[in-house]
């Protein structure tokens, strides 16, 4: 991997390698873009095949956070950390204390959070060394479980997509096929049920399915059958890449709007659903409620204020679909354009984030 060529191609700012022999820490912090503010992104712990795979993942995820934060209207850039190791057996307190000191050394250019393989408890340990961490225990003034807030954002985004497809944002009487009934999807189902939608659900966890059936009168189907259901809206809320060659030809929905990450297996599948006339709410725009919520901690968390910001996902999806129509491009490209246009507007007056008295961090 020609590292500097790759960083130059996608305009990365900084890559930080963190090592602590005593604790076993091997971490890579990638900072993609700080035009809008300090880089916010979680810390992932994973058993990577090799160091190059870890570097590539950190870079890819950091760039994704730039777009997610920008499209969400946050005054934050994009970053990400990967820690090389098995989260089930390689963790120790010293590791996260050492990592916290590395974050502190960046003086606010990067703020971390929980991600795959890390926990709230890990964030609390990091917090012993630095304030540049979010998603810590509620006792320290954090926002707590993000699932209900993420679900509310998906619900708002789904209504905006429904308005584009059906001429009204009312979901009453609409049939919605929800794939996955985990914490976020369960809360989404609650909102949909309260508005009078008809729910079809599936999950590999039979208990989760049964709970949705009992609580919301949902109809359960086998996991492989969810794509072919007669429904108005398909809501992918489990694994990624469920919009692919096999599933697209089965879809009968007019709208795709759900909480899952990386819903398109390949970008060409986004082109396909656009050509089919399906209204698509891009994943990183519609599921941004979690990051919007956690970002509010930087101001001193206020649940009412955070929820008000999450309501804005409705308008964000509207803008994405307007750009899609304006420029004649698929929604996934329109989401990228929304983020890029916002960054470019700010770039004219600001090139790189440095800690000073006029950033989000000065309000902590």
UniProtKB/Swiss-Prot annotation:
Pathway(s) of this molecule: Amino-acid degradation; L-leucine degradation; 4-methyl-2-oxopentanoate from L-leucine (dehydrogenase route): step 1/1
Biological-process GO terms, alphabetical: L-leucine catabolic process
Keywords: Branched-chain amino acid catabolism, NAD, Oxidoreductase
EC number: 1.4.1.9
Enzyme class: oxidoreductase
Reactions catalysed according to its record: L-leucine + NAD(+) + H2O = 4-methyl-2-oxopentanoate + NH4(+) + NADH + H(+)
Database matches in CDD domains: NAD_bind_Leu_Phe_Val_DH
One GO MF term: L-leucine dehydrogenase activity
One Pfam family of this chain: ELFV_dehydrog
Protein residues bound to NAD(+): 180-186
Catalytic residues (UniProt): 80
Family listed: Belongs to the Glu/Leu/Phe/Val dehydrogenases family.
Role of this protein: Catalyzes the reversible deamination of L-leucine to 4-methyl-2-oxopentanoate.
Name of protein: Leucine dehydrogenase
Species of origin: Bacillus subtilis (strain 168)
């Amino acid at each position: 991997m020609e590292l500097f060529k790759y960083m130059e191609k996608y305009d990365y700012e900084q890559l930080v390698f963190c090592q602590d022999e005593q604790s076993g820490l091997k971490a890579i912090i990638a900072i993609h873009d700080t035009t809008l503010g300090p880089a916010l992104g979680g810390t992932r712990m994973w058993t990577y095949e090799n160091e190059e795979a870890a570097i590539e993942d950190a870079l890819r995820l950091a760039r994704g956070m730039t777009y997610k934060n920008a499209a969400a209207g946050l005054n934050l850039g994009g970053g990400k950390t990967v820690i090389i190791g098995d989260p089930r057996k390689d963790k120790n307190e010293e590791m996260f204390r050492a990592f916290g000191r590395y974050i502190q050394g960046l003086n606010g250019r990067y703020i971390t959070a929980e991600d795959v393989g890390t926990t709230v408890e890990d964030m609390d340990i990091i917090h012993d060394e630095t304030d540049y961490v979010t998603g810590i225990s509620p006792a320290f003034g954090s926002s707590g479980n993000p699932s209900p807030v993420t679900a509310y954002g998906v619900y708002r985004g789904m209504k905006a997509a429904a308005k584009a497809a059906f001429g009204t944002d009312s979901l009453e009487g609409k049939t919605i096929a929800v794939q996955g009934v985990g914490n976020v999807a369960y809360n989404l189902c609650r909102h949909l049920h309260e508005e009078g939608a008809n729910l079809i659900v599936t999950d590999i966890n039979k208990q989760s399915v049964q709970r949705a059936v009992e609580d919301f009168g949902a109809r359960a189907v086998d996991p492989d059958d969810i794509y072919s259901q007669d429904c108005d809206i398909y809501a992918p809320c489990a694994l990624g890449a469920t919009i692919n060659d096999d599933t697209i030809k089965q879809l009968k929905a007019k709208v795709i709007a759900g909480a899952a990450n990386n819903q398109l297996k390949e970008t060409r599948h986004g082109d396909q659903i656009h050509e089919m006339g399906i209204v698509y709410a891009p994943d990183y725009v519609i599921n941004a409620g979690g990051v919007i919520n956690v970002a509010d901690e930087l101001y001193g968390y206020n649940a009412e204020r955070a929820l008000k910001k999450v309501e804005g996902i409705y308008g964000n999806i509207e803008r994405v679909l307007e750009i899609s129509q304006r420029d004649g491009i698929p929604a996934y490209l329109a989401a990228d354009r929304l983020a890029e246009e916002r960054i470019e507007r700010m770039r004219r007056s600001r090139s790189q984030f440095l800690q000073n008295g006029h950033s989000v961090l000065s309000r902590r």
